[in-house]
Structures are given as C-alpha cells and as structure tokens.
C-alpha cells in the first residue's frame, strides 16, 4: 500500500515539475527562469555599461511624473482627515458622556442589590 502511494506521489510531482518547466509565459521564456537569468548575455562585459543598462531599464510599474504636485495635495488630505478624526472622537465622547449622565440621573437613589444584600 505504501509503495503504491509513494509511487503515485512521485509520478505526480514529476508531472507537475515537467509541466512547470515547459510552461511558457507571455514573453516566450520558461516560467521558472523568468526572473534573474542564471547565465546572462555576454554583451554586458563592462560594469559601467551594465549599471547604465540597469538604470535605464523600463520596469513594469510607472513612476508618477507629478510627484511635486501630489505630495502637497496628499498632505492637505491628511490634515483634513486628522481634523475629521478629532471631530468624530469629540462627538463620540460627548455622546457617551451624555448617555452616562442620563443613566446616572434617571436612578440616583437606586442601589445595587443581590438577593437581600444591598451595597
């Protein structure tokens, strides 16, 4: 029973690895070697050229061009959100204090009693 189970697991893993190794991505490179290549091209023998190529490489994400305008706007939004948060906290505090005052004023002479023992 164990031999059958282990052989099934081995064949399943072998099948999975073979499918992953032959799986092609959108760019035509195998899925497992998509990132950093093990053996890079030999055209970058000079270190300075390699660094310049890496600096000029286009990445998948886009860098925002209007960061000078976006930062002050974000700062203003942050300040407004902080003011709104403070107002919300103040309103919550006033509501809870009003509710607590209402509870205490409605039963000022009541004492907590358990069976025949009152505190």
Swiss-Prot record:
InterPro entries recorded for this chain? U-IIB, Urotensin_II
UniProt subcellular location? Secreted
A GO cellular component term found in this entry reads: extracellular region
Entry GO MF terms: G protein-coupled receptor binding; hormone activity
Superkingdom per UniProt: Eukaryota
Q: Which UniProt keywords apply?
A: Cleavage on pair of basic residues, Disulfide bond, Hormone, Secreted, Signal
Signal peptide start and end residues: 1-28
Which BP terms from GO are recorded? blood vessel diameter maintenance; regulation of blood pressure
Prosegment residue ranges: 29-109
| Keyword Aminoacyl-tRNA synthetase applies | no
- Here the disulfide bonds are 113-118
Q: Report the protein's function.
A: Potent vasoconstrictor.
Family the UniProt entry places it in: Belongs to the urotensin-2 family.
**Identification of the protein by name:** Urotensin-2B
């Amino acid at each position: 029973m164990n031999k059958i189970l282990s052989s099934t697991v081995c064949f399943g893993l072998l099948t999975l690895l073979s499918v992953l190794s032959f799986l092609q991505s959108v760019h035509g490179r195998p899925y497992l070697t998509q990132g950093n290549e093990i053996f890079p091209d030999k055209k970058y023998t000079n270190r300075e050229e390699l660094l310049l190529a890496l600096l000029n490489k286009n990445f998948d994400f886009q860098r925002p061009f209007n960061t000078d305008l976006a930062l002050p706007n974000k700062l203003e939004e942050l300040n407004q959100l902080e003011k709104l948060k403070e107002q919300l906290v103040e309103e919550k505090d006033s509501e809870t204090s009003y509710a607590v005052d209402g509870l205490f004023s409605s039963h000022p002479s009541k004492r907590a009693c358990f069976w025949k023992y009152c505190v």
